[in-house]
């Protein structure tokens, strides 16, 4: 008789767990939908900014004194800013990003890395690359000021010839 009670109790516990899981999925789906709407609503602005910068620099002589960030730089070292997640619960998001990065990294040039996201930091350290800054522990917007200073100073002082931003693009 106690076996039947035990089995019924386990069935009830399993149903409760199932209900909690469904509720969590609904909350996650709602949050995901809001995040997707924000990403989609910002896309036209990002596209227009890229077009404007392209038009401003296309076929024109750029005065390095006036626009130092738009002038050519002959430094051989590159800077890669890698934006990844802090946790791994995101399907193939990080693995696809890291595979693409690993295939793309210029092998013949010296490259420094800056990371946003714990998973990106761990990858760069595992690959034995030169990690000069990590903003994983701070909120993204809190780290932007330090990152901008690093980028502008590194480029204007001739430390970096090219600066790349590596991230997942929401389609």
State the predicted function of each range.
Residues 2-171:
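Conserved loop-to-helix interface motifs that mediate assembly, gating, or partner/ligand docking
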């Amino acid at each position: 008789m106690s076996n039947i009670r035990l089995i019924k109790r386990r069935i009830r516990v399993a149903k409760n767990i199932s209900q909690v899981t469904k509720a969590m999925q609904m909350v996650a789906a709602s949050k995901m939908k809001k995040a997707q709407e924000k990403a989609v609503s910002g896309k036209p602005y990002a596209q227009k900014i890229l077009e404007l910068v392209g038009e401003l620099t296309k076929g024109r002589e750029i005065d390095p004194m006036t626009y130092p960030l738009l002038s050519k730089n002959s430094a051989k070292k590159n800077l890669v800013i890698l934006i990844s997640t802090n946790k791994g619960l995101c399907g193939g998001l990080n693995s696809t990003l890291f595979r693409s990065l690993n295939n793309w990294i210029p092998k013949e040039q010296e490259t420094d890395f800056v990371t946003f996201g714990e998973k990106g930091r761990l990858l760069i350290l595992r690959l034995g690359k030169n990690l000069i800054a990590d903003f994983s522990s701070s909120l993204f917007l809190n780290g932007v000021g330090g990152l901008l200073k690093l980028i502008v100073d590194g480029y204007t002082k001739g430390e970096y010839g090219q600066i790349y931003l590596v991230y997942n693009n929401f389609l």
